[in-house]
Amino acid sequence: MSVQEDDDAAGPEVDRLRRHDSFYGDAEKVSNDKSHGTGENWARTLQLAFQSIGVVYGDVGTSPLYVYSSTFPDGVKHPDDLVGVLSLMLYTLILIPMVKYVFIVLYANDNGDGGTFALYSLISRHAKIRMIPNDQTEDANVSNYSIEAPSSQLRRAEWVKQKLESSNAAKIALFTITILGTSMVMGDGTLTPAISVLSAVSGIREKAPSLTQLQVVWISVPILIVLFSVQRFGTDKVGYSFAPVISVWFVLIAGIGAYNLAVHEITILRAFNPMYIIDYFRRNGKEAWVSLGGAVLCITGTEAMFADLGHFNIRAIQLSFTCVLFPSVALCYMGQAAYLRKFPEDVGDTFYKSLPAPLFWPVFVVAIMAAIIASQAMLSGAFAILSKALPLGCFPRVEVVHTSNKYEGQVYIPEVNFLIGVASVAITVAFQTTANIGNAYGICVVMVFSITTHLMTVVMLLIWKVRLPFIAAFYVVFTFTEFLYLSSILSKFAEGGYLPFCFSLVLMALMATWHYVHVKRYWYELDHIVPPDEMAALLARRDVRRVPGVGLLYTELVQGIPPVFPRLVDKIPSVHAVFVFMSIKHLPIPRVAPAERFIFQRVGPDAGHRIFRCVARYGYTDPLEGAKEFAAFLLDRLKVFVYEEAVFACQCAEDGGGGGGGDDDGVLRRAEEMAAEEKRLIDAEAERGLVYLMGEANVEAAPGSSLMKQIVVNYVYTRLRKNLREEHKALSIPKDQLLKVGITYEI
């Protein structure tokens, strides 16, 4: 039975009692729990701005530890080279983090969430670019789905939308660069702890010159091991104690920078003249171009501003960046350049050499803490991004532990933490110096910048509907700038740049494999859905018994009867008294309000069977409830649906009988009588037990498939599926209530 709404006939009392699901008009609007607009009061914004200092800026704030040594690995050839490089770093900080991210990209958030997947989800709401065809009309009624169709006046946006939806190549390209960006962030996550901790610990050689670099490495390794070991406790346990530490760090580096500027050479301020950048390139040619790979390290961690937006708001990040981060690091870089003008031989360890002697130990301790916090922020960002990829079927199933009751984005992924931890320790031992790690570091950073630029261009065309000259200027300026940096970094590919690149490609290949088979499996089920007449014949068989209890059969399909159902009935010729085809569906939005979670439909014949379809909708940051809580909520909403269905049936009967709407109290009374028995039956069957049914699909490449497809499906995907988390564990389904049905899909 399908239920449809007739707004004109429904009385106010009926409207009040209806649940707003897929069969009743627009969903009830609820307010988003995070404000990212202008409505935030300034006291709250200032508080968030302070907190963001500790969470967002750890990485970019610790870059002064190693930027000059990475930019001048062979020493300073000419005193004015320092002015040119300083000018280059200042304008890089202004152009990419400040102009691009702080004042443009942050506004392309997905209901307050940022990052590569947030951009992809934002685009996918305005154009059907997702590979799995599980869109439903009612999804647009969810409160924070909030799409605005391109207006007829702006034909360009309609044209872009049409091209994206009609081109498989465009869909694949968008998805590919999205997972590449995610993979690059993961590659960045392996290098940030290594270079940050190693550069901070290296300062100890100033007071203990007898220590070798290898000994410094072995001091750094235990710190890294402790860092990765405590991830399971979550950042919330020490959370916003980060802000005071990083604030002290910024005060120290700004003060020391101002001191060096005043004591050594105040004229270094002429670096604000961009002509010194041109002079630097004229004087050094190819060497200047190669040095870009070191200079770009001054903006590592910039993507974290966007990825961590969900914890703060736009104004808070704009305030903390322009008033705290930029002045502090700019003063630090200017002070270091002023110091190096007098002592160019100290470029290999600029940060610690430029410290006033009495401040060495306090700064050393704070530097170690800041390096750990920088690593922590990068790891938290990597976990958060992957947790968004999981619900969209873009990453193999792994355990996601929510470490904070207050901040939903704070998660921990044990398998990924172990992988990054091993890689980070191995990189530290293998590369040993910050200069060597710096060669490998930049490639991930700049490629993520470039990917964001391309996705932002699509957002401007499709969603913001910005004028073409502005879009062209944005694309040309940032693509050209990022290409210059990327080309320089790639020149160091053989010196270490290959490492994060290969790591990212392997991770990307695993994500692509998982998603490819996931999509193919969905299409197979969609192509083999059970026709209604076959469903009726199946339930009418004499050997099919009606057994007590509630059965939940999990399926990815949001429409139709999955092919595993006939298999189940053949093996166990019985159907539960209350049977629900259960689909867990993730929408391309961060959150779905609990009131809008479920949509129901009655399916199959009524005779002796109560069979329903239920789609439970989640955002990509919504945690799944435990099995017990989920089942209780589901059955509660099912009883509400049964009641609303009865209300609607009575209302339709009243209208069909010429009552013209009739007495609302009479309608409700008849509805209550119709629904009471069915609600009692649902309660009774729930008391008798709940059984979870799942199809254990063995996916194989169809006969005649190419060798590559056989390898991807039969070996890579199968090995991933068997060695990673099982689906019932991801759903927290108790084993003693689980029944699996084996089935083979040839795709």
From Swiss-Prot:
Identification of the protein by name: Potassium transporter 20
Places the protein is found: Membrane
Its job: High-affinity potassium transporter.
Segments crossing the lipid bilayer: 48-68, 85-105, 172-192, 210-230, 238-258, 289-309, 319-339, 354-374, 411-431, 443-463, 470-490, 497-517
Positions in the Cytoplasmic compartment: 1-47, 106-171, 231-237, 310-318, 375-410, 464-469, 518-747
InterPro entries associated with the record: K+_transporter, K_trans_C, K_trans_N
Family: Belongs to the HAK/KUP transporter (TC 2.A.72.3) family.
Residue runs in coiled coils: none
GO cellular component: membrane
